[in-house]
């Protein structure tokens, strides 16, 4: 009986997030280098932030035989409740049959709550003279302390809302004092 009484308070302290973290909007494309990419988003519908997210892609041929297993990461370090995190799994496969499947799994840890204090206050998308897509903008630190190692992630969608590609940059300088702004270019 003492074991059961100990277990009940322990279970109340553990906040489950199973089933509330989902992979959505995933698809594949072949990059300019001929390499297969699997892109998509992870959505956090739990009440807790999650971090240390690892995506596991299992590539299979048309008969279900496993060809390869590849680990990938979400481009952000943490996904806050109600938010999404983009991923781009770059495979080792240059020659893939037209008939292949993949399964996605993931692992994560629950993280301590934190405030979302970095805000994109302006952004613009245009093409340069070589027809490359350029996204530029300004971020602001609305927190009380200096923020370090700030990443800006861009997720591009097709007209049907499917993820086309993702990109990430780290701002320079790599810190932003409270109340200050910084520019980014992706």
Task: Name each model feature, range by range.
Residues 54-57, 72, 151-154, 169:
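Hydrophobic beta-strand segments
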Residues 48-52, 67, 99, 146-149, ...:
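Short acidic/proline- and small/hydrophobic-mixed sequence motifs that coincide with surface turns
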Residues 67-95, 164-186:
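Intrinsically disordered, low-complexity Pro/Gly/Ser/Thr-rich segments with frequent PxxP/GP/PP motifs
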Residues 19-39:
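Short N-terminal segments immediately surrounding and downstream of signal-peptide cleavage
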Residues 42-47, 139-143:
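Asparagine-centered strand-capping/turn motif at beta-strand->loop junctions
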Residues 33-39, 129-136:
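Short, solvent-exposed loop/turn segments enriched in Ser/Thr/Gly
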Residues 76, 90-132, 166, 173:
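Terminal connector regions
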Residues 4-17:
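Sec-dependent N-terminal signal peptides
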């Amino acid at each position: 009986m003492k074991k059961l009484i100990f277990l009940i308070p322990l279970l109340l302290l553990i906040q489950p997030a199973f089933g509330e973290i989902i992979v959505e909007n995933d698809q594949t494309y072949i990059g300019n280098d001929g390499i297969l990419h699997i892109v998509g988003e992870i959505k956090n519908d739990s009440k807790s932030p999650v971090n240390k997210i690892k995506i596991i892609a299992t590539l299979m041929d048309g008969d279900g035989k496993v060809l390869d297993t590849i680990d990938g990461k979400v481009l952000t370090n943490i996904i806050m409740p109600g938010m999404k995190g983009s991923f781009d799994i770059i495979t080792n496969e240059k020659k893939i049959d037209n008939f292949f499947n993949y399964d996605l799994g993931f692992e994560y840890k629950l993280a301590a709550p934190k405030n979302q204090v970095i805000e994109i206050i302006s952004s613009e998308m245009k093409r340069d003279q070589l027809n490359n897509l350029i996204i530029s903008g300004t971020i602001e630190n609305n927190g009380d302390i200096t923020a370090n190692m700030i990443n800006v992630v861009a997720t591009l969608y097709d007209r049907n809302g499917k993820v086309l590609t993702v990109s990430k940059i780290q701002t320079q300088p790599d810190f932003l004092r409270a109340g200050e702004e910084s520019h980014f270019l992706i």
